[in-house]
């Protein structure tokens, strides 16, 4: 187990962030916002590149950390949703600093439960779900509706620092995340994979 932990730490430390993303991460910490790890961000960037995704949705803008990784692929447009307007204001500035052209990143302020139903069905290739774990199952249902065939839903923080794997942990967010994993794994027409990178990623692909 010690070797695995050491290997995990080595992989996590192998990614060097650009100054803009690092600044967004530092600000997120000041806001108390949980960000994906650099290795996770790099993995997401790889997923979008390999899948050829051109249209993505993100639930949970934060200060823009994950979005900055997603838009490193110049062909991808991003719609990002969050209820926290102050953090989103900073995210807009970080996207601008990163060179995102006008119209490439659409930042929407509002609750995911209100915004997701307004987005067009089967119009996106990639969705990153990084919102409130207590709302994740309902959000995931809407996110799957948005995806085209072959599209990919990625749920961030799917292991919650290892708490999801500990049967003794019964906090609300842990139980909700376990239920989401079970729900998606039992949903017909999708293939799932739980990846132990960063804080965990749950991948669900539309067959």
List PLM regions with ranges.
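Class I SAM-dependent transferase core
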Residues: 1-57
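S-adenosylmethionine/decaboxylated-SAM
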Residues: 38-207
């Amino acid at each position: 187990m010690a070797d695995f932990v050491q290997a995990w730490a080595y992989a996590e430390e192998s990614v060097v962030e650009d100054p803009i993303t690092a600044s967004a991460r530092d600000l997120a910490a000041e806001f108390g916002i949980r960000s994906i790890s650099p290795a996770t961000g790099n993995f997401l960037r790889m997923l979008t590149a390999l899948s050829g995704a051109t249209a993505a949705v993100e639930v949970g803008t934060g200060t823009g950390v994950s979005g900055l990784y997603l838009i490193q692929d110049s062909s991808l447009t991003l719609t990002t949703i969050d209820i926290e307007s102050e953090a989103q204001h900073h995210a807009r500035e970080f996207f601008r600093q990163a060179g995102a052209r006008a119209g490439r990143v659409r930042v929407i302020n509002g609750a995911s439960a209100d915004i997701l139903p307004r987005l067009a069905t089967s119009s996106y290739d990639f969705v990153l779900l990084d919102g409130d774990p207590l709302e994740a199952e309902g959000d995931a249902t809407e996110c799957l509706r948005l995806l085209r065939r072959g599209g990919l839903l990625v749920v961030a923080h799917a292991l919650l620092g290892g708490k999801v794997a500990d049967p003794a942990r019964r906090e609300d967010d842990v139980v909700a995340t376990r239920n989401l994993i079970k729900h998606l794994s039992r949903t017909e027409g999708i293939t799932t994979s739980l990846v132990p990178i960063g804080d965990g990623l749950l991948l669900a692909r539309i067959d």
